[in-house]
């Protein structure tokens, strides 16, 4: 009987008293239970002892070479079992003995050697397992047979099979079984080790005995890839985090289990049946050749040879080929740099240069293809009308006949396109055959020189004609560049294959081969026909058979004269034949003229069909990316090939509209310029991607060069002006307009474009260059580390700092996550992307920097030391004032004050921002909606909001990791679901009206988002800190919101020197080139404050005083040691003057600056170790209470202002 699939079994615990686990939990599936009850009796002893790998005495069937017959890679199993660290060798030995006894009983014989070996194995394994906490058991699938068959197998074939266990991470195999040498059936067993890395059997199973995933293509697919859902490799957390207490089984080890990739493959296979995919010949080569060979081949190439001569005609063709070949190489490089989907030129450009260029080119390229349909159809209709005119069977008149025939033709072409790509491809093959026959007809005709054709200028291959036609003979104001402009549209069409990239079986291989080979073949044909027609036909001929020369002339200079024809009449009159006069030269030369007409029909219709297919496919890809939301309806596809039927209809209508005009002489140059603009950007994309040096730019096609691509882009731009300068300018204006529109709209896409790569490279290079620049006072910028916590929980703090750092200095939003490290790390990784997006969305030029620490002080230290890069490091710490310090735990207050000391220790400036209403709005549920409503109707008083009053307001500097403050709306817009949001649209708490305090808090939180009006910024520059106190208000006045505010400067001075001090300060400010409206010198700062204010201060600090004079010395010392923040009597007396100064300054602030928009004031400094935290906090409270917004600023006492140039 064949061994059945293995059942995962949980090894019993080695510690006495532990029972067997009920099952092991599987990811995404139900719990797995133990073996069938039929085997329980045979294996009870082994299981209860917790010993062997198999947990029973029945060995698996072997192959006689010491290898088990299973498991196969898809059948491998493993489970993780808790192993007691105290499990000794006795348990393992008992298990081995039980297993040996069971095996002996089943086989009917006793094998002491085997028992001994098994015992030794168990001892060794038990000691090894005792070293760790977990054991991984790999179970042989052969052991999962039914109970009856397993016993019989043990006695039969499998009796001598090996029992295999894995040790040391699964790399070394411990085998208990037959010898590697075939014996004479003595039954002797021995124990041996061998390395699985040198064993082919175990190499086959690599990757199935571990949670780690082996490299596979499914891990690198995009979620929206054609193959279905992306298969996720195990996350780092799954491999690295501590295991849960409950044993589990790795889902990746179970071969028979369904996986996302397997399901996706099945779904994709089912949906893919019948989908038409083309190879490189039918999909690219044929299309490109048909698109390149247009009407020019048959009705304009002979005229070009007549104007430019054979030599310059070859130069014209070669120049066009250079442009198209370089573009073909660039297209091949981009197409082989990753999986290419539908969208052709749009897809290539957008994924290389980004949505801005891609969106602009995609729209005009799709439009150009749609109008190109009309151009080719009108060319076809004109040829048909000429035939009708020759036979005098016009329906109405020439212009209306072109409209009627064109309309009928485009309807038929639409039917072929809508019928499906398969039918369209078949039509292309038929048209190519006709085109090739027409070319062959011309080549054959050049060797057939009929007497009737000589009067029309065709003499066959003659050296006289070749020599005469080799040089140029420009007429009617034609020049080399005008001739080149007429020919170049005949060389376009090289993107016809790339435009249907989504319908190619292997775009990466098909596009380079098909495009480059098509360019080569068509160029050879163009040059061959140019040389042939220039060697056979003279420039001018009368078509009159009577113009032959019967007598030999000795003074002949023209080739016709040497060939006995006199066409001198054409020198002074207009003739109807010859290269210069007859557009139907190829029909005249050919062996069968109607076949040339068929070739013209084939060339026009094939090009029209290719454009009719390309335009909707490009437009559909553009609409799928939602670059232009108004066109989203055209993204829908129908049928098995996802055909863009709506795009077909739109293309049909555009083409029909231009067909009805029937005059495309003005539109044609614009279309050619649209194509050339696409070529230019494709070439520039390769140059740009190579210049950015992105590791992701590694095309499989190696035959490209970034500088050649740049030359190609420049050549395309030059050719645009050569063809038509005003059309080139119009194209540039349209591309620029669309680029600006897409840039303004900022589509929510991220394609890893070279623009992003170059931005990174530029930032990296400039950062490295900046690191070598020494600091200079003239280049000082405030680079602020703002302790915001969650950035949107303190909007006033964020906006005020942003006002003086925007486009001037660095702003980093520091957020200290506290709590369990494991949870905090997960939240930090989520917050990093979430809050950075929030800052960008709210147009905040700032960086979000989360850090995990045990407490706020430690986290702030980490940020101050490590935040930033090179010279782009913070130099100023910005904090919100701790408004709730009187009710808070004084240990938190002590920690808050220590942030100041830490900042000063590492030479940081410190800025403390205080609003009397407070800064933190995170306790208000739905704050973002309220903020927007406040901006719209600030007078509203009856706002209803969910308020969580149970949450204690934390310090205005940081929040713990669990306190998030981002709305669910933002989460949905960002495309992520919050794991632990603070704010929700639907709160379970009671809905209560917003109280007055919170209403004022919300109003205050938005005050810096508005224009500040004509008011004052009062600068109390009491102490010289290097100039930071003066620099910040100046920077504020340079911003649009603050530009109407005037700076008033307050300084301290002596009563008898007020005028002198004012003049000295005015002189200094003028040297600093800082405008001010007034300077006020305060001579009464040192006056004793009002008695009631002193009493109020004493009452405030009373709960925090030590009162050591009223206590015993030991008790006082102990209390000071345990609570170092307490204010001692000695300290209070020592700093009485400084205390009075803070109280007095508050009185002066209320007197002079109560109406100011904002007050910027010198921050008092407390000596570390001398001033307690409670006293320092009391100073700040007394100084800044009941005032307009206050900035307490203290620089690091290094100059940040200078009056030297």
From Swiss-Prot:
Residues 23-35 have a biased composition (Basic residues). Residues 1-22, 87-102, 143-155 have a biased composition (Low complexity). Phosphorylated at Thr-196, Thr-200 and Thr-205 by OXSR1/OSR1 and STK39/SPAK downstream of WNK kinases (WNK1, WNK2, WNK3 or WNK4), promoting its activity. It is found in: Basolateral cell membrane. The chain crosses the membrane at residues 280-309, 310-329, 361-388, 399-422, 426-447, 480-497, 513-534, 592-616, 645-665, 666-684, 708-725, 726-738. Signal peptide: none annotated. Glycans are attached at residues 546, 555. Residues 389-398, 448-479, 535-591 are extracellular. The keyword Disulfide bond applies. Residues 1-102, 143-187, 953-986 are annotated as: Disordered. The modification N-acetylmethionine is found at residue 1. K(+) binds at residues 291-292, 376, 489-490, 492. GO terms for molecular function: metal ion binding; potassium ion transmembrane transporter activity; sodium:potassium:chloride symporter activity. The modification Phosphothreonine is found at residues 196, 200, 205, 210, 223, 259. One of its GO terms (cellular component) is basolateral plasma membrane. A motif (RFXV motif 1) lies at residues 77-80. It catalyses: K(+)(out) + 2 chloride(out) + Na(+)(out) = K(+)(in) + 2 chloride(in) + Na(+)(in). Chloride 1 binds at residues 294-296, 489-490. The modification Phosphoserine is found at residues 74, 76, 235, 933, 937, 987. The keyword Acetylation applies. The RFXV motifs mediate binding with OXSR1/OSR1 and STK39/SPAK. This is Solute carrier family 12 member 2. It comes from Mus musculus.
């Amino acid at each position: 009987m064949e061994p059945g699939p293995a059942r995962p079994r949980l090894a019993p615990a080695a510690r006495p008293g532990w029972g067997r686990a009920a099952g092991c939990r599987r990811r995404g599936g139900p719990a797995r239970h133990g073996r069938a009850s039929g085997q329980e009796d045979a294996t009870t002893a082994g299981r209860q002892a917790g010993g062997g790998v198999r947990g029973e005495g029945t060995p698996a069937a072997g192959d006689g070479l010491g290898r088990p017959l299973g498991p196969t890679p898809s059948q491998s199993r493993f489970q993780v079992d808790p192993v007691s660290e105290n499990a000794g060798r006795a348990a393992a030995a008992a298990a081995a003995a039980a297993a040996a006894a069971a095996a002996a009983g089943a086989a009917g014989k006793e094998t002491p050697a085997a028992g001994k070996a098994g015992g030794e194995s168990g001892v060794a394994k038990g000691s090894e397992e005792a070293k760790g906490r977990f054991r991984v058991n790999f179970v042989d699938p052969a052991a999962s047979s039914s109970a009856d068959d397993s016993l019989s197998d043990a006695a039969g074939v499998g009796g001598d099979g090996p029992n295999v266990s894995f040790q040391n991470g699964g790399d070394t195999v411990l085998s208990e079984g037959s010898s590697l040498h075939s014996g004479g059936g003595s039954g002797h067993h021995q124990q041996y080790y061998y390395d699985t890395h040198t064993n082919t059997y175990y190499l086959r199973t690599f990757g199935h005995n571990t949670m780690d995933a082996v490299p596979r293509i499914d891990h690198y697919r995009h979620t929206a890839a054609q193959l279905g859902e992306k298969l996720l490799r195990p996350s780092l957390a799954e491999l690295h985090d501590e295991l849960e207490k409950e044993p589990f089984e790795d889902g990746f080890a179970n071969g028979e289990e369904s996986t996302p990739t397997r399901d996706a493959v099945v779904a994709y296979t089912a949906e893919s049946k019948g989908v038409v995919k083309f190879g490189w010949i039918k999909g690219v080569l044929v299309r490109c050749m048909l698109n390149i060979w247009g009407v020019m081949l048959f009705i304009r190439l002979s005229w070009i040879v007549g104007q430019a001569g054979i030599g310059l005609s070859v130069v014209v063709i070669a120049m066009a080929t250079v442009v198209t070949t370089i573009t073909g190489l660039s297209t091949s490089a981009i197409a082989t740099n990753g999986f290419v989907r539908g969208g052709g030129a749009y897809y290539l450009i957008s994924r290389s240069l980004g949505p801005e260029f891609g969106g602009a080119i995609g729209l005009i390229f799709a439009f150009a293809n749609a109008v190109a349909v009309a151009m080719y159809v009108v060319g076809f209709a004109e040829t048909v009308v000429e035939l009708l005119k020759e036979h005098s069977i016009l329906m109405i008149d020439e212009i209306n006949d072109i409209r009627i025939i064109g309309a009928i033709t485009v309807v038929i072409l639409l039917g072929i396109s809508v019928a499906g790509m398969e039918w369209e491809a078949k039509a292309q093959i038929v048209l190519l055959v006709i085109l090739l026959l027409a070319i062959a007809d011309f080549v054959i005709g050049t060797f057939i020189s009929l007497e009737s054709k000589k009067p029309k200028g065709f003499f066959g291959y003659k050296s006289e004609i070749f020599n005469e036609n080799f040089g140029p003979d420009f007429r009617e104001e034609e020049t080399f560049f005008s001739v080149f402009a007429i020919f170049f549209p005949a060389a376009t069409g090289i993107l016809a294959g790339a435009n249907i990239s989504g319908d190619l079986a292997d775009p990466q291989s098909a596009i380079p081969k098909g495009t480059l080979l098509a360019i080569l073949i068509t160029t050879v044909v163009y040059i061959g026909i140019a040389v042939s027609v220039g060697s056979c036909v003279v420039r001018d001929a009368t078509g009159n058979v009577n113009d032959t020369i019967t007598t030999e002339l000795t003074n002949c200079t023209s080739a016709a004269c040497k060939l006995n024809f006199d066409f001198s009449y054409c020198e002074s009159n207009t003739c109807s034949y010859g290269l210069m006069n007859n557009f139907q030269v190829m029909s005249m030369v050919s062996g069968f003229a109607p076949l040339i007409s068929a070739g013209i029909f084939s060339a026009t219709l094939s090009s029209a069909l290719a454009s009719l297919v390309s335009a909707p496919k490009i437009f559909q890809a553009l609409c799928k990316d939602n670059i232009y939301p108004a066109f989203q309806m055209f993204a829908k596809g129908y049928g098995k090939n996802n055909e863009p039927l709506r795009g077909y209809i739109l293309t049909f209508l555009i083409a029909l509209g231009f067909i009805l005009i029937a005059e495309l002489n003005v539109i044609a140059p614009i279309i050619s310029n649209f194509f050339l603009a696409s070529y230019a950007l494709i070439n520039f994309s390769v140059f740009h991607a190579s210049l950015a040096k992105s590791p992701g730019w590694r095309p499989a096609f190696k035959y490209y060069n970034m500088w050649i691509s740049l030359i190609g882009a420049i050549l395309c731009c030059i050719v645009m002006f050569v063809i038509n300068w005003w059309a080139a300018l119009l194209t540039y204006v349209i591309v620029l307009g669309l680029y600006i529109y897409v840039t303004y709209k900022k589509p929510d896409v991220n394609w890893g474009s070279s623009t992003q790569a170059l931005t990174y490279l530029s930032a990296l290079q400039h950062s490295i260059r900046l690191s070598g620049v020494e600091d200079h006072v003239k280049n000082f910028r405030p680079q602020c580390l703002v302790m915001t916590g969650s950035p949107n929980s303190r909007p006033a703090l964020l906006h005020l700092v942003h006002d003086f750092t925007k486009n001037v200095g660095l702003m980093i939003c520091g957020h200290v996550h506290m709590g369990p490290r494991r949870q905090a790390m997960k939240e930090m990784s989520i917050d990093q992307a979430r809050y950075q997006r929030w800052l960008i969305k709210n147009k905040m030029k700032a960086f979000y920097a989360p850090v995990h620490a045990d407490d706020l002080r430690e986290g702030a230290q980490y940020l101050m030391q490590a935040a930033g890069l090179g010279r782009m490091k913070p130099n100023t710490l910005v904090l919100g004032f701790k408004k709730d310090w009187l009710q808070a735990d004084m240990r938190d207050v002590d920690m808050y004050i220590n942030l100041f000391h830490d900042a000063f220790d590492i030479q940081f400036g410190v800025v403390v921002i205080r609003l009397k209403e407070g800064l933190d709005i995170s306790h208000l549920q739905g704050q973002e909606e309220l903020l927007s409503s406040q901006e719209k109707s600030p007078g509203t008083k009856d706002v209803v909001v969910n308020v969580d009053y149970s949450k204690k307001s934390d310090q205005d500097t940081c929040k713990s990791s669990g306190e998030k403050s981002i709305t669910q709306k933002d989460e949905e817009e960002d495309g992520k679901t919050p794991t632990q949001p603070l704010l929700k649209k639907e709160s379970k708490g009671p809905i209560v009206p917003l109280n007055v305090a919170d209403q004022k808090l919300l109003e205050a939180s938005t005050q810096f988002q508005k224009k500040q009006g004509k008011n004052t910024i009062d600068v109390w520059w009491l102490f010289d800190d290097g100039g930071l106190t003066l620099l910040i208000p100046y920077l504020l006045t340079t911003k649009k919101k603050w530009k109407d505010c005037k700076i008033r400067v307050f300084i301290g001075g002596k009563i008898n020197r007020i005028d002198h001090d004012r003049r000295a300060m005015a002189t200094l400010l003028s040297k600093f080139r800082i405008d001010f409206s007034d300077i006020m010198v305060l001579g009464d700062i040192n006056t004793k404050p009002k008695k009631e204010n002193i009493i109020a201060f004493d009452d405030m600090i009373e709960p925090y005083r030590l009162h050591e004079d009223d206590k015993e010395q030991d008790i006082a010392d102990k209390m000071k040691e345990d609570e170092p923040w307490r204010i001692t009597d000695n300290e209070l007396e020592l700093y009485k003057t400084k205390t009075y100064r803070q109280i007095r300054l508050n009185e002066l602030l209320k007197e002079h600056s109560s109406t100011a928009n904002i007050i910027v004031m010198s921050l008092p400094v407390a000596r570390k170790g001398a001033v307690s935290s409670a006293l320092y906090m009391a100073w700040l409270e007394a100084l800044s209470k009941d005032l307009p917004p206050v900035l307490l600023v203290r620089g690091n006492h290094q100059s940040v202002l200078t009056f030297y140039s």
